[in-house]
Amino acid sequence: MENNGYKIHVAYGFHVNCYHSYRGDTNDAAGFGSDIRIIRGIIKTLDELNAAGIPVKGTWDSENFFSLEKILPAYAPDVLDGMRRRVKERGDENIIMGYSNGALGAMQEDELVSSVALAVTNPQGSGLKDLFGACEMIVRPQEVMFTPSQVKTYNKLGVKALCLYYSCVPFDAFKTLIPPLDDEKAYNPLTFEYRGEGLIVIPTYSNADVCDAGCLRAWVKELRKKQLDGTVKNDLFLFINMDADAIFWESLNLPVVKNRIANTDGIRGLVKEVADLEYVVFDTPGGYLRTHAPVGTIRFTQDTADGNFTGYASWAEKPYNRRIWTAIEKSRRAAKARENEEDFLNRLKLLSTTHFGLATPVLNIQREQTANELAEKLMDAAFLPEGPLTLYNASGTVLQCVQLRCKTAKALAVKGEGLEAYTVLPMGDDSVFLLLRFSEVKKEYVITAEETENAPCGDEAFFTLESAGTKLEFGADKRIRRFSINGQTVGGEEFLSSYLTYGGKRYDFSPDGMEIGWLTGGRYIKLFGGVGLPKAKRQGAYAFTFFTSDAVKGIFVLADVSYPYTPERDAISTENSSLGRYTDMRWQEAAPFCLSFENERPVSVIKRNFEGDISAFRVDSYAEADPKNRTLDSFNNQLTAGLIGLTDGRKGLLLGFSRSVLSSMACCPMRLTEGGRVKMNPFGTFDGRQRHHPNRSGDVVPRTYTLIAPQGKSLAPSYNGSRERALMCLTPFEGELPDEERMRELLAFADGAFATGTDTLLAPYNGENVWVQSAEKQTGKVRVRSPLFGGVKGNPVKYAFRGARALGYIVKKQRRAK
């Protein structure tokens, strides 16, 4: 084999974010102390390697507001000095993470633009150009959160490329979304295309991928062999990027073996393993892009994130997530009526992924307190009770939907200029939800209300709700029998299921009764009953109020679920995770309103992101990327800006939900079962087997990773003792999508109106629709167990066996690579 002149460029990326969901705000092991220690060590080691003649460079993607502006200047100015010096003297590179380590993929366009722009330069001087003099216009999104329509926004910003994981473990962005890439494409820039726009994507790898190859030297030699035999006809770029506080960057100093085993000597070992190979070039992403063009094109329409189940689960499926996200949505609605720079910046800060996850099943208490304070600021700013009761039109249509505080339990008559029809839905406390249709589109509507007689009612009993060809039929057994559109069945007797999985056993919600009645401007059928678990301190209850409206087509449902509360005795603090609280890890799944779609052909998921883009992806694409993913216990690659749904091309089901009542960035996980059937789990969470990722180690490393990764645990314990109230619209349709008018109405319901001012009976609602169980103060003798050995994800023998197999694999590959 001849030397063909091709090189392998290796880059090391350090993801600097000192603001964690699983640790607090102190300069010690319970806070950001380990970040500072490890980053100092990285800088020191890189300096030593350079002094020894090895021209290694670092690539830093750093969070600005919390880390560069607050924490590091106060507690570790030497770290900033070291980073600045290395940029100037050693060619280190800074790339963009985002101003407040925000959930970039779930941002509106204005939020994304500001997050990137402020990361480059800002008045506080914490921008990358402010601190380091320069930065590459390359974005490594926090948690690799990305939605395809943002290609256009990134292009407007002058962003050259995104770094997205193409990884062998669930800490990944797109490896399971597209057919496997050959090595020439997997280690080179690619062009991502979406609706006529293109943006470079750099496939990125983590320390888990290094272990999957055995060691970096084995990985590089394997790729070199393909260059020499002609399988690969190009230079290759291997970008290893991981959290800067990861222990893999520092020497583990293991007894006896003394760091002689690969992957135990931190950044020093990773560099020295390949420093003697003449075909290795130490580089940076920007450096490689300056001399290398994209070698291929990729396309996918899923939304990416690197959380549990390779998606958005970790930041979107906990009740607490929805509490914080709904405050963000209310702030967004308020901005339609009142622009305020301070509110906007507070919203950017609250959009930090750290206020939602990755911590599982709950956040660090201190982090939760900070998020609560920011959310309260946004809620207070959005509460404007002065003047007449006015609805600001956020949807640009004649349909206005809003939750309001109500001072009476009596029926209401609502008045307003041009008001043609309306429905009043009591929400079960001191609030109501109004659906109002006006005769023409205006920027704002003034309304008033007065008490009236109870809603008119008929004498007949009914077991069916109908609206514009949609029929929801109930049986005397207090269950749904059939859901259809113009005679086509969308769901049968299994259409709706409600259950918890606890301690390995399924517990279905217990129906107690069914209530039939009339609303002002509609009629309803309410199903209600109990939600029980064994030995619960407090049992739960549910009520699903299905109703129709004179103001708009569709069948709506108010879902109010109070979960049982079980004793919490499992500690969830570890060496790397200081959550400071207990939980009950026997909770495994929460499926309060699980919907089964009766498809006849392959299914596509319809979704809407927060830029307003509506797109779809085929669930078959998972199996096309990896046949082992023909079924998936859970997937959440679908952002939910008020809309989510399924279609088989002939018929479909859209679920709209009021974003200002209850929402999250991705509130509807799904399950793909045999035969291509999909279950939707709005405001719930699934558990089970993680998605399979193609890998080099015969699943040895990925299986070990999924066993020990704390974010891989179930999110269901976060539902313990909580209560949530959501308002949804069930919209079956024929064809691939509903007609434009129906879609416009559904989005108007989802986006809602923003209310200011006060009437004698009605006022803006500034309360909650999600209540989270307070952390229980432990007293007396408590049997505390680590969730690592709680039985939910295995036992110590399994951990030891898989760990030994992984270690043996690494040692074997290391020996062969000498």
Regions picked out by a protein language model, each given a short descriptive name:
Residues 2-137, 144-201, 217-234, 268, ...:
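Catalytic alpha-helical scaffold of carbohydrate-active enzymes acting on polysaccharides/glycoconjugates
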Residues 17-19, 64-67, 100-104, 144-147, ...:
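Short, solvent-exposed loop/turn segments at secondary-structure junctions
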Residues 22-31, 251-262:
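A solvent-exposed, charged loop/short amphipathic helix patch at secondary-structure junctions
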Residues 97, 139, 240, 284, ...:
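Conserved, mostly hydrophobic/aromatic
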Residues 153, 252-256, 295:
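Short glycine/threonine-rich loop-to-helix capping motif typified by GTGT followed
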Residues 234-257:
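A conserved active-site cap/scaffold subdomain adjacent to cofactor or substrate pockets
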Residues 258, 265-511, 518-520, 524, ...:
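Terminal accessory/anchoring regions of large secretory-pathway or extracellular enzymes
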